[in-house]
Amino acid sequence: MAAKVLKFSHEVLHAMSRGVEVLANAVKVTLGPKGRNVVLDKSFGAPTITKDGVSVAKEIELEDKFENMGAQMVKEVASRTSDDAGDGTTTATVLAQAILVEGIKAVIAGMNPMDLKRGIDKAVTAAVAELKKISKPCKDQKAIAQVGTISANSDKSIGDIIAEAMEKVGKEGVITVEDGSGLENALEVVEGMQFDRGYLSPYFINNQQNMSAELENPFILLVDKKISNIRELIPLLENVAKSGRPLLVIAEDIEGEALATLVVNNIRGVVKVAAVKAPGFGDRRKAMLQDIAVLTGGKVISEEVGLSLEAASLDDLGSAKRVVVTKDDTTIIDGSGDAGDIKNRVEQIRKEIENSSSDYDKEKLQERLAKLAGGVAVIKVGAATEVEMKEKKARVEDALHATRAAVEEGVVPGGGVALIRVLKSLDSVEVENEDQRVGVEIARRAMAYPLSQIVKNTGVQAAVVADKVLNHKDVNYGYNAATGEYGDMIEMGILDPTKVTRTALQNAASIAGLMITTECMVTEAPKKKEESMPGGGDMGGMGGMGGMGGMM
């Protein structure tokens, strides 16, 4: 086992503090509308230019192992805030640095670290409760656009396109971000339920222009097995032919004579038909077939539940207003399922998302939820160069998370004002001793840091602005760092999602509190360089080998 190096007490706090200082100073220059860019060197390709706090934090590794531990702990604050709320990483880092710096001063002055932490925790609990009180719901498109704009570093085009996407696919809809091909951002919306399986034979195409099979008001047959024997299908096909309506067959697979018969019937015009494979694999396929059944008002023909294909009737089939099948995907528009059943299914999937611990499963469940509840929107990000594309795409993704958070928990005045407004709630926090009271004061001073940093990044005197904002009666009154004006932050469109501010404060206090109460650090001792072999001085004796010439 490698040898270890230990540090104790004040040495620990100083080492951690230095590491946090380096990381936080690099991150906090990006805060606010006048925040600066940070250029990150990459081992290959062009450097990345970013104003995203968590991207900067992730790049930082320090040489001194003790300092690095401090930096890594604050990096955890930024990452966790990004995971929980999608934004607010820089605010969280600034808060963590502030709490730690103020906390270390108190510990070195001889106060009890555990009581300081308890005081900080009590202050944060009171502040979060007050945040929820001043929070306003974020419902209309204008407010959503404003939140997106602020999160995308004041890029209005990004805020507007996110608000438009949310309006089109609903709050539950899936919005994905992709590289675009032009210079401008573009929005594509897929109506209805779309899954990535195309037609099994090009002979099903009936629209030569789009190379797609389009079925108006079709029946939809859902089968949870392979169909290769046509005899199973004939009774149902005859009934569908009599009804004069088209048929979409979705099965695990359709092959051999079954597929050939469907193609022949389609070409001859006996029954207009298209066949596709069911989406997904294994259990996920079963779940997705059930989703389609609920959406279209049909049943999944499965031997597991005692339904056979031969005995299936028209009552077992689903239907939709329109179905479009292309080479790569199938879209079911306006399925005729019962609204109550769809709502119940959506609730069931929501519960599964809550109970799931895997990010991958959550993402797949979220996609299923969106297909049932709303639709899918794709934001195509346009840019002139690849470097700009990467930076812009990261901003769009951040803004998307922030707007989702705003819809979830509402909005508070932005620009660091919300944290200033909750300071009054700290006056009524009950403490057990003087050290806890100092803990509350540490949190109070830290909560004013984000506003000061935003103002500092604009080049204005921070203390003057903070004082003016703090002493104003109106909850929404603040400083617009982009224009240099004072006024109502909500009216000026400077909003922060409540969830982002809350998460940043809670995560910063949690990690900074742990750091203040750290008494010992252990790390591996640096390896000593192995001594090189001594210079070959005694090789000189080999000079006598010259006499070997006589051996010839």
From Swiss-Prot:
GO terms for cellular component: GroEL-GroES complex. Disulfide bonds: none annotated. Coiled coil: none annotated. It comes from the Bacteria. The keyword Iron does not apply. Pfam families: Cpn60_TCP1. GO terms for molecular function: ATP binding; ATP-dependent protein folding chaperone; isomerase activity; unfolded protein binding. It is found in: Cytoplasm. This is Chaperonin GroEL. It comes from Coxiella burnetii (strain RSA 493 / Nine Mile phase I). The lineage of its organism: Bacteria, Pseudomonadati, Pseudomonadota, Gammaproteobacteria, Legionellales.
